């Protein structure tokens, strides 16, 4: 039997953690991984130029003044070791015939092997409305991140939404589905339905 693998990307506050849990419960997938923990594991070993010791919203500082280009340069520096790890985790799950969901801030399909891209369901979730996005960040302490106040992240909404726009462009270029979570219940159901269709076609 083929592995059922979902790789879901999105910046903080868009609902990827809770959606991943919802899909796992509704598909009986036991393994759900967050790139936050992969990043924490890699920090002592990652090359210095990846700047993984720095929060992603500050990684632009290694390139000078804040600009969209520098935000993305810092993001991609951090993404390289993370995406390398994600690529290998998915390849291992495929080799073992295991089911897996990975949710990640870092979502750069161009850094993944074509074999992995062909055999995993990729999706990117986002929020259209910046005010709603800010509100969701501030509320997430009540749901999924009880010891991580969202106000700290909301202060960097500009950086996160720059990363979001870049990632959405990359996803469009690869024909990867985009899912607006402005209507959260609708988005998670669409994702679940599309994932099931992907699995059934394989």
From Swiss-Prot:
Record note on temperature dependence: Optimum temperature is 60 degrees Celsius.
Catalytically driven reaction(s): (R)-3-phosphomevalonate + ATP = (R)-3,5-bisphosphomevalonate + ADP + H(+)
Keyword NADP (UniProt): no
GO molecular-function terms, A-Z: ATP binding; kinase activity; phosphotransferase activity, alcohol group as acceptor
UniProt organism field: Thermoplasma acidophilum (strain ATCC 25905 / DSM 1728 / JCM 9062 / NBRC 15155 / AMRC-C165)
Swiss-Prot/TrEMBL GO biological process terms: isopentenyl diphosphate biosynthetic process, mevalonate pathway
SUPFAM superfamilies, A to Z: P-loop containing nucleoside triphosphate hydrolases (SSF52540)
Pathway: Isoprenoid biosynthesis; isopentenyl diphosphate biosynthesis via mevalonate pathway
Record flagged with keyword ATP-binding: yes
pH dependence text: Does not demonstrate significant pH dependence in the pH range of 6.5-9.0.
EC number(s) reported in the record: 2.7.1.186
Protein name per the record: Mevalonate-3-phosphate 5-kinase
Stated role: Phosphorylates mevalonate 3-phosphate to form mevalonate 3,5-bisphosphate. Functions in an alternative mevalonate pathway, only present in extreme acidophiles of the Thermoplasmatales order, which passes through mevalonate 3-phosphate rather than mevalonate 5-phosphate.
Key words of the record: ATP-binding, Isoprene biosynthesis, Kinase, Lipid biosynthesis, Lipid metabolism, Nucleotide-binding, Transferase
Additional information: It is proposed that Thermoplasmatales adapted the classical archaeal mevalonate pathway by replacing mevalonate 5-phosphate decarboxylase (MMD) with two specialized enzymes (mevalonate-3-phosphate 5-kinase and mevalonate 3,5-bisphosphate decarboxylase) in order to produce isoprenoids in extremely acidic environments. It was found that at low pH, the dual function enzyme MMD is unable to carry out the first phosphorylation step, yet retains its ability to perform decarboxylation.
